[in-house]
């Protein structure tokens, strides 16, 4: 099937997920034709590579050797850099964000927030910081780039530059989820052994503006549990709130 056809990526992604179903989230990640194999040590990695290559051969799928990289200690994948210590924002993506000039239209705001938002899990309270700009995305909002918008814009760029390295979660260890809520939005962080796995945040929905504080705190906890359910299901965790 030609990659020029509209449905080809979705079809191929579905096929690859079926081929590697038994290995997904155990030692392999797949995005269309990119296959990432990860392991704890070299012996384990050797076995994982054998299983993956045998599975490809079994389904008559062949990898081009010149486009393969093996035994890497650090790898760029979907805008991130993954290595032994954790996961970081790809520096090349950070450079493109820092060079962004102040938006002059709603479309440019949407483009910037789309790019910055892809890395929102690295930024504490992303939604609160972005709020002055997201207000301009409302249907009847008049575009006016204020000092508050400029401060929001510059703060997000700065946060991406200094974004922390997030640890890779260990499903054998306990999770700790910390939640925060205010009239400015909901925020949460999930951690293991005092180190950040991911941040999450969102702005309040119109009806939530009338919530009592205790209900906002509950909404923050619900948002966190939904966001990270793939980490928390079948695992022990504790939730903390102010």
What spans do the regions from the language model cover?
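Retroelement reverse transcriptase polymerase core
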Residues: 1-239
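Short loop/turn segments at strand-loop or loop-helix junctions that form parts
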Residues: 242
């Amino acid at each position: 099937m030609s990659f020029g056809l509209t449905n080809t990526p979705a079809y191929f992604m579905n096929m690859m997920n079926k081929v590697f179903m038994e290995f997904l989230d155990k030692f392999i990640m797949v995005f269309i034709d990119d296959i990432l194999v990860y392991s704890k040590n070299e012996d384990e990695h050797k076995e994982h590579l054998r299983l993956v290559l045998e599975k490809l051969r079994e389904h008559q799928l062949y990898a081009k050797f010149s486009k393969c990289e093996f035994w890497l200690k650090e790898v760029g994948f979907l805008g991130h850099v993954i290595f032994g210590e954790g996961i970081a924002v790809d520096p090349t993506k950070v450079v493109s964000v820092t060079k962004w000039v102040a938006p002059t239209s709603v479309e440019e705001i949407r483009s910037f927030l789309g790019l910055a938002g892809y890395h929102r899990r690295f930024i504490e309270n992303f939604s609160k910081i972005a709020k002055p700009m997201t207000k301009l995305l409302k249907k009847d909002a008049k575009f006016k780039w204020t000092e508050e918008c400029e401060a929001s814009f510059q703060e997000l760029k700065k946060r991406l530059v200094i974004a922390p390295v997030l640890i890779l979660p260990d499903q054998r260890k306990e999770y700790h989820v910390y939640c925060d809520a205010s009239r400015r939005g909901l925020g949460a962080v999930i951690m293991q052994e005092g180190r950040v796995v991911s941040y999450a945040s969102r702005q309040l929905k119109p009806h939530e503006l009338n919530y009592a504080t205790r209900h906002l705190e509950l909404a923050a906890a619900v948002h966190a549990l939904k966001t990270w359910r793939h980490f928390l299901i079948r695992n022990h965790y504790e939730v903390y709130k102010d």
